[in-house]
Amino acid sequence: MGMYLMRSIGKEGMYKSDLPDFMVFLDWKELPWYWYGFDHFSISLLAILVLPGLFAFVFGYFAFRSRIKGVYFAIITQAMTYALMLLFFRNDTGFGGNNGLTDFKRILGYSLQEPSTKMSLFIITAIVLFLSYILSRYIVKSKLGRVLTAIRDVESRVMFSGYNTLNYKLFIWTLSAFLCGIAGALYVPQVGIINPSEMQPANSIEMAIWVAVGGRGTLVGAILGAGLINVAKSWFTVAAPDYWLYFLGVLFISVTLFLPKGLIGIFDRFSSQNKNKKL
């Protein structure tokens, strides 16, 4: 999406060139081959949907086939992401280096500065979130979801029952990458910048905090935790910009110690108490 938005700038950039501004600044003479086609939204959309899933499928196939799991799987994924982050920081990779891709002007001909465009992107994001939730809920409630839960709990017993756990894990891993690609495509035009620092391990840790705060083992909990943490981050960065990370850490530790089931656990507790009163 960032590449499409950069190509949409055209000659409205600082250097009035068909090349993105950072390429002109670095004295690039022509567009790299892997940028071809990204001036078309249809090709960009296809890449958004296909490339993350394809990359995840290839990586997941070899990782799951080698029976890498648990903390070792987490380490290897973080190490690979960190290596890619360092690669994208290089100016010669053609993705803007440290500054990344920014100064986006429009999407599909609509100015990104217009309130109507911002609202449209927000509504599209909300719709995609809702559809993703429905899809995830359907999977969880289906036979596929029950098998995935069993694999999570005791994979060896699932294998002894005759299931090929590789296929199940590979499917859900690829699906998650597919959804992440869509989320990233919606994130970039609304934030206005994308650079390699977005690939740092801290972002993965923050997502784990979202789930822990909202409630592990639930779909709504992840959404609730993401909303709460980002609101808290926005408030803390303004109120205490030098200490907001400490506040975030205290919040995470407090929830882990006193609310092991997250915020969803509070609602479950109240609902169970109400049921007991009715009985």
Where are these regions (language model features)?
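Transmembrane alpha-helices and adjacent helix-loop boundaries
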Residues: 1-279
